[in-house]
A protein has these predicted regions:
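A short, active-site helix/loop in glycosyltransferases that binds the activated sugar's phosphate group
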Residues: 27-75, 80-84, 90
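A short helix/loop element that forms part of the nucleotide-sugar donor recognition site in Leloir-type
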Residues: 86-99
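Conserved donor-binding/catalytic core segment of Leloir-type glycosyltransferases
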Residues: 100-118, 124-128
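Nucleotide-activated donor-binding/catalytic signature segment of Leloir-type glycosyltransferases, i.e.
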Residues: 137-140, 147-174, 182
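A short alpha->beta transition loop at the rim of the catalytic pocket in nucleotide-sugar-dependent
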Residues: 181, 203
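Aromatic "clamp/platform" in nucleotide-sugar-dependent glycosyltransferases that forms part
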Residues: 188
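Short hydrophobic beta-strand element within catalytic cores of glycosyltransferases
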Residues: 205-208
Length: 214
């Protein structure tokens, strides 16, 4: 529904025409965003395309795009296999991952945890405020970070932090969900993240900002 971007944040140009994209250097003679938009407008048979969004929020956003026009847009959430993503024994999951069994664990997960849009800085700030108001959490609570570049955040928290890195093994991801007490996803903009649905399927409460499909 846009010319080139996957995350629009506060930009609403897609409602009329994408041009002079803030994600790109200032155009010198050639506006890539505008040219790409115009090429999409010329796609033959475009009016007969049925679009599928994976959340109601994305469906509603796409309907506002001038590229979509009057085309049909349906919403079908990504499926989650609840035979795989399901609740298991918390202590056993922690032992498998080498995580403490005597602490409350907060999970943050992202493909790349240093991505500013994922809101890690807000979790760091929230943990700092909680530590000032309730110093005991420095002893009884820890943060688990799942995703690429997790080790770069080791010095960001006053709370104990356990970087698990980028994990592709599905069973290990299920163990991570089952090992924690709460999943925090402070994204500034997001669709309907699979991580939230997976965590909830494992019986883990989720906390996030009221943005996008969250």
């Amino acid at each position: 529904a846009t010319a080139i971007c996957h995350i629009t944040l506060d930009c609403r140009k897609f409602e009329t025409q994408c041009e002079k994209c803030y994600l790109l250097p200032l155009p010198i003679g050639c506006d890539i965003a505008k040219r790409t938009w115009q090429r999409k407008e010329l796609i033959k048979g475009r009016s007969h395309i049925i679009y599928i969004a994976c959340s109601k929020w994305l469906q509603n956003e796409a309907k506002k795009s001038a590229l979509i026009g009057t085309n049909v847009i349906e919403s079908i959430p990504n499926p989650i296999d609840t035979n795989i993503f399901c609740k298991t024994n918390k202590n056993e999951a922690r032992k498998k991952l080498g995580l403490p069994t005597d602490k409350r664990l907060i999970l943050f997960a992202s493909q790349r945890v240093t991505n500013n849009n994922k809101g890690m800085s807000y979790l760091v700030e929230a943990c700092e405020k909680m530590a000032k108001q309730h110093p005991e959490i420095l002893v009884n609570t820890a943060v688990v970070v799942l995703g690429g570049h997790a080790e770069e955040l080791c010095n960001s928290f006053r709370l104990p932090m356990y970087p698990l890195g980028y994990v592709v093994d599905t069973q290990k991801i299920v163990d991570v969900y089952n090992a924690v007490d709460v999943f925090v996803t402070p994204s500034l903009s997001d669709n309907l993240p699979n991580t939230i649905m997976e965590a909830m399927a494992c019986g883990v409460p989720c906390v996030g900002f009221e943005v996008g499909g969250i």
